[in-house]
Every structure is written in structure tokens, then in C-alpha cells.
Amino acid sequence: MERRIGLELGPAAFDENFTTEGLTEREACIGDIFEVGDATVQITQPRSPCWKLARRWRVPDLAIQFEETGYTGWYLKVVETGLVASGQQMKLVERPHPDWSVSRATKIRYRMPEDRKLAEELANIESLGESWTTKLADRAETGTQPDSTPRVYGPNLPDNNGDEA
């Protein structure tokens, strides 16, 4: 992503709590359970990039670029609390949905709005986050995709001259 947007990004560049090395959205799957330190965490959904990242890094379409690449990051829920320290390994202990990588889920949600069947399959994964489950189930039922403009651009919408508002 750094090469694509022409910026050097450091740790926590996107306000993340965990930064992983060697585990990308192509390998990580919805429902994956990890032990890290004394805690146990589970991937619940891809991150939905928003306008705040674009504003922070001054790249108006940054959220769209993340969606296009599939490198959105993901959300973890705490299954078991415990102490965690920087530098500790995340050990995969369970992968209940090996066919549902984070990047595949992102592609289905944002780049395949016409595929109601896959939206329904993804929505039926019990460990998927509630907001994603609701939106995908609605899409599977109605065939409509909500407008992502407010999330993606927010107050950063360009005006009619192509300048940032």
C-alpha cells in the first residue's frame, strides 16, 4: 500500500491495536481463533475503511484503494481476556472457515454487489460481525447494496470543480 499511495506508513498508521507480520487478508479467515499472550481472540470481519483514513493521510480515495486491494485489515473480538505485549506471536488455534479469507469477504461485500448467493453464504457464518451479517443478509434478500459514499468519502466529498470540499 505504501508504494501505491506514495507514503511511508509506520506501525498503527491506521489506528490498529495489533499489527501482524506475515499474516495478510489473503491468509487470515473469518472465524480464525488465535492465542496471543494470555488472551484468545477471533477474527469477526474485515475492516470497513472510511473517510477518516483518507483525511488523515490526505488521499481522498484511500478507502476505495483499500477495498480494491483487499488489504483492509480485520476486527478481532476478545474470546478470553489476558495480558498481551508487543512482539508476542499470534498462534492460530482454530480455523473453522478456511474458505472464507478476509480478502474474499471484502471482495464479496464491496466488489460483487450482484452476487446474492455469496452474500447469503457469508452472512450465515456464525462468527461474522453483526454489522456485516445484517448488511449482507439484507443484500441477499433485496438484491440492493447500500450507498457507501458517506462511509468512504464523508465530509471529504469533492465539489463540482473536483476540489476537496
Regions found by a protein language model. Give the residues of each.
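Metal-cofactor-dependent catalytic cores
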Residues: 1-165
